[in-house]
Amino acid sequence: MKKFLKILFKLVLILGIAAGVAYGGYYGYQQYQKREQAKATFTSRPDVEKAKDGTSISPGHHNLAYFKKQLNEKYPDVYSAAYETPRASKIGSSVVIPGQIVTPSYDFNKKKITDADSMTPQGLTVAGKYLLISAYDSTHNHRSVIYCLDKKTGKYLKTIQVPGAPHLGGIAYDPVAKNIWVTGSQDDSSALMSFSLKKLEKYSYNKKKQPIKYDNVISLPTIERASCVTYYDNQLFVGFFNTDGQGQIASYPIARSGDFKGTITSDQIKAVTGQVSWALGSGSASMDRQIQGIAFYQNWIILSQSYGSKDSKLYFFPISALNNLDEGNAEKVVTMPPYLEQI
């Protein structure tokens, strides 16, 4: 009897251990599945969220947590400047660029509004209480657009459609005349186009079914292809992007009085045909190739350089170097993530 009980005890013990191992393995597998699921959720594209007009307002690729993790791992200095340094601005540091998944825009082929899924962000500027982001359809089937966001909250407000499909590589705001300027082309020449902040605020595609109407279309014969524009000290600074050589930056003073108040035509006019005005820059300087953006901050001129999937760079020049913006003269160079556009 005792021998039987010993055998029974051993058998129960073995079964108990086996059950424990099985349960532990099952529990461990469950935890593994949960971790993998959480990892997949963490790295995958968030569920698509749309505004009332059908424009996507959710991130196009990753959620903010994953974005910050990747940024911290690959570009720790940029992460520190963005998220760990006391903020110098009340404008949000992390804003979702709308329309990356879908943007309703006029389809040139179908002659109606359809969903564009290839909008490529280009320029950005702060205009009054708004943050404006320009974008074009990389398939060239839809009108180019400007997304309008609340600059404090980053909330998407509306989309402004512009005439045609310009690249919209640059966008700037003149706070004196309250005009918004964008880069484009006119009759095979680079051009600057503008419309007022008041017109932007009133714009609604659903009301007139038309793109916004420009107040000024000004051709720039001295610029091969305008890729960036910025406002500084009552001037517009315009540059063109060149993939294999030196580029150029030209400054255009904005008239503050007279018949051409608020535009860059004043005494620079060479010829006027209808609404097309030809202007020559009052001052110009060479700039490094592959430049996508230019900004003035305190005593610095900052250029962004980007091309393809390689790291981008920010070049910091003293403002006295305006006539010699060669990368060798930069006092500071900061490595940034790829595809850096306007700054």
For every predicted segment, state its role:
Residues 136-138, 185-187, 240-244, 299, ...:
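Short loop/turn segments immediately following the C-termini of beta-strands
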Residues 126-128, 173-177, 231-233, 296-298:
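Residue-level detector of Asp-centered blade-edge/turn motifs that repeat once per structural unit
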Residues 120-123, 170, 226-228, 293, ...:
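Conserved beta-strand position repeated once per blade in WD40 beta-propeller domains
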Residues 280-329, 334, 341:
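Loop/turn-rich, solvent-exposed surfaces of beta-rich toroidal or solenoidal domains
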Residues 118-121, 145, 154-177:
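Blade-loop segments of beta-propeller domains
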Residues 2-111:
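Sequence/structural signature of beta-propeller modules
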Residues 140-147, 188-199, 244-257, 309-320:
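Structural motif
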Residues 112-117, 160-164, 217-222, 282-287, ...:
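Surface loop/turn motifs at the tips and blade-to-blade linkers of beta-strand repeat domains
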